[in-house]
């Protein structure tokens, strides 16, 4: 628990970090938040980059993984592989509502062609478990592998932002896909197995597909292009449902 939440001047901090590299941003986070620093992962296409980069600096950092219960088999195997290789301090969180129970109550929300259904799905399967993780782990700050090129919302981010009660820190914010590839190669790290199938981003099995001609963004391959964000990386307010609508996964 201990320790007070730092009161950061975000403009000053982001100006300072604008000259820093990704490792230096992680080191800054570790020094600024000696307690209550976590990271999140989706075990997605490029997740090995952040997992390796952060754990080289903070080996025992709690790594939060939201298991929706709908991930592809390959993702579960990839998670095991990376967890063992990097000796991750993995904290797995799931919705208290099982997939079968959710479908009985609400139907297959991902098949309902409206944002409200997708937002309900995301809240049940992703947002509520993440909020619980932040609370139970007494998180003050959260390292995430968001990059400016991924969604409209992410273009607006700084290296450090405030989301709800926590600070959010984005060490690879300005990295390009080429930077990611070069880091993976330099450290002999794996892509998710679906990369070889043409996927540039992967989430739940029912809402991800390979990149196709005509896609304007890699996030168009998720939720049939209707949403870009899942809600985990959008501001958490009392109007959660409405805020999820603003830029969704």
Curated annotation (Swiss-Prot):
Keyword Membrane in annotation: no
Single GO cellular component term: cytoplasm
Catalysis performed (reactions): [thioredoxin]-disulfide + sulfite + adenosine 3',5'-bisphosphate + 2 H(+) = [thioredoxin]-dithiol + 3'-phosphoadenylyl sulfate
Keyword Nucleotidyltransferase: no
Subcellular location field: Cytoplasm
SUPFAM superfamilies assigned to the protein according to its UniProt record, in alphabetical order: Adenine nucleotide alpha hydrolases-like
Active site per the UniProt annotation: 230
Pathway(s) it belongs to: Sulfur metabolism; hydrogen sulfide biosynthesis; sulfite from sulfate: step 3/3
A Gene Ontology biological process term: hydrogen sulfide biosynthetic process
Keyword set, alphabetical order: Cytoplasm, Oxidoreductase
EC number, UniProt record: 1.8.4.8
Record GO terms (molecular function): phosphoadenylyl-sulfate reductase (thioredoxin) activity
HAMAP family for this protein: CysH
Family indicated by similarity: Belongs to the PAPS reductase family. CysH subfamily.
Job of this protein: Catalyzes the formation of sulfite from phosphoadenosine 5'-phosphosulfate (PAPS) using thioredoxin as an electron donor.
Protein name: Phosphoadenosine 5'-phosphosulfate reductase
Protein source organism: Picosynechococcus sp. (strain ATCC 27264 / PCC 7002 / PR-6) (Agmenellum quadruplicatum)
Lineage: Bacteria, Bacillati, Cyanobacteriota, Cyanophyceae, Oscillatoriophycideae
Gene: cysH
């Amino acid at each position: 628990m201990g320790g007070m939440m730092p009161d950061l001047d975000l403009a000053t901090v982001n100006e300072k970090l604008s000259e820093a590299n990704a490792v230096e941003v992680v080191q800054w986070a570790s020094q600024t938040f000696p307690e209550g620093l976590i990271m999140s992962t989706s075990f997605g296409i490029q997740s090995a980059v952040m997992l390796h980069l952060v754990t080289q600096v903070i080996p025992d950092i709690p790594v939060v993984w939201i298991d929706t219960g709908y991930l592809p088999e390959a993702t579960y195997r990839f998670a095991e592989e990376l967890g063992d290789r990097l000796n991750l301090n993995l904290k797995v969180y799931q919705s208290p509502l099982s997939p079968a129970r959710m479908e009985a109550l609400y139907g297959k929300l991902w098949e309902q062609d409206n944002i409200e259904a997708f937002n309900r799905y995301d809240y049940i399967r992703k947002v509520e478990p993440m909020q619980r993780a932040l609370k139970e782990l007494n998180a003050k700050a959260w390292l995430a592998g968001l990059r400016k090129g991924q969604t409209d919302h992410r273009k607006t981010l700084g290296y450090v932002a405030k989301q709800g009660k926590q600070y959010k820190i984005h060490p690879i914010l300005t990295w390009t896909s080429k930077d990611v590839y070069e880091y993976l190669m330099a450290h002999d790290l794996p892509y998710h197995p679906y990369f070889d199938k043409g996927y540039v981003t992967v989430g739940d099995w029912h809402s991800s597909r390979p990149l196709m001609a005509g896609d304007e963004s890699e996030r168009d391959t998720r939720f049939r292009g209707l949403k870009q964000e899942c809600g985990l990386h959008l501001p958490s307010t009392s109007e959660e449902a409405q805020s999820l609508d603003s830029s969704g996964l």
